[in-house]
Amino acid sequence: MDLPPQLSFALYVSAFALGFPLNLLAIRGAVSHAKLRLTPSLVYTLHLACSDLLLAITLPLKAVEALASGVWPLPLPFCPVFALAHFAPLYAGGGFLAALSAGRYLGAAFPFGYQAIRRPCYSWGVCVAIWALVLCHLGLALGLEAPRGWVDNTTSSLGINIPVNGSPVCLEAWDPDSARPARLSFSILLFFLPLVITAFCYVGCLRALVHSGLSHKRKLRAAWVAGGALLTLLLCLGPYNASNVASFINPDLEGSWRKLGLITGAWSVVLNPLVTGYLGTGPGQGTICVTRTPRGTIQK
């Protein structure tokens, strides 16, 4: 299913128009909370919001590229820079969502033990590790891409593919023999593993909610916050990573499904700020998960 270029353009522009201000608000809200008390959830939220902000900044260029049917509109050296700026947040977001979910689950399942060891410095270390893993993986994939001009009558280097007498294409014409294994490894390590962690933690938070003493309204809100990360992974990042797996198994499925997956991935910049819960400015409006202990109900 090929989306019309005008529709792809409109979807990218809409994601930018909504996601850019939402993530600015999320950063502002998280910073205001951090001034009162810095917590691991705030650290993950700040990194996620900054990651989404970087992704949102690349969306206007992606929209222009879609309107031009994939033709790269900038000078060729900007292609690898764009690749890192666009795809690093796309993959890193799953790691930050999994880290947020793990923190909520540990706070619910082991409230007092987790309270004793939860330190923002540990969360900063996790975030640095996620960024390093993503950037090294992407950098290695781009660096190993070899020029194939003598083989397939094209000029290819660092993500740019230029058919002879044709227009430059960034990444989307990447040699399939290199692209499919690389994209599959990205998806397994940076999406499906975080997805499993997030799903496990979501079930743990739901079990804690069942035994909590909160009102029905607050239980619903807590369930939404706990399930928001899983929802974002499935709805926004799921289609793109599923297309990577499908195209590895059956190369005929590549192309239009990948383009659709990139569009849904772009909309994660809209959904993430809504589910992390830091758009408000008042204290205590952030992400929560609850549990009942012998000393009362604890919120995370």
Curated annotation (Swiss-Prot):
Superkingdom of this protein's organism: Eukaryota
InterPro entries, per the entry: GPCR_Rhodpsn, GPCR_Rhodpsn_7TM, GPR40-rel_orph, GPR40_recept_FA
Swiss-Prot/TrEMBL keywords: Cell membrane, Disulfide bond, G-protein coupled receptor, Glycoprotein, Lipid-binding, Membrane, Receptor, Transducer, Transmembrane, Transmembrane helix
Paired cysteines (S-S): C79-C170
One record GO biological process: phospholipase C-activating G protein-coupled receptor signaling pathway
TM ranges: 9-31, 42-64, 80-101, 122-142, 179-200, 224-248, 257-279
Gene Ontology terms for molecular function: bioactive lipid receptor activity; fatty acid binding; G protein-coupled receptor activity
Membrane topology: Multi-pass membrane protein
Glycosylated sites: N153
Topology, Cytoplasmic side: 32-41, 102-121, 201-223, 280-300
Localization: Cell membrane
Extracellular-side segments: 1-8, 65-79, 143-178, 249-256
Site note Important for receptor activation, residues: E145, E172
Tissue distribution: Expressed abundantly in pancreatic beta cells.
Gene3D superfamilies: Rhodopsin 7-helix transmembrane proteins
Function of the protein: G-protein coupled receptor for medium and long chain saturated and unsaturated fatty acids that plays an important role in glucose homeostasis. Fatty acid binding increases glucose-stimulated insulin secretion, and may also enhance the secretion of glucagon-like peptide 1 (GLP-1). May also play a role in bone homeostasis; receptor signaling activates pathways that inhibit osteoclast differentiation. Ligand binding leads to a conformation change that triggers signaling via G-proteins that activate phospholipase C, leading to an increase of the intracellular calcium concentration.
Family: Belongs to the G-protein coupled receptor 1 family.
Identification of the protein by name: Free fatty acid receptor 1
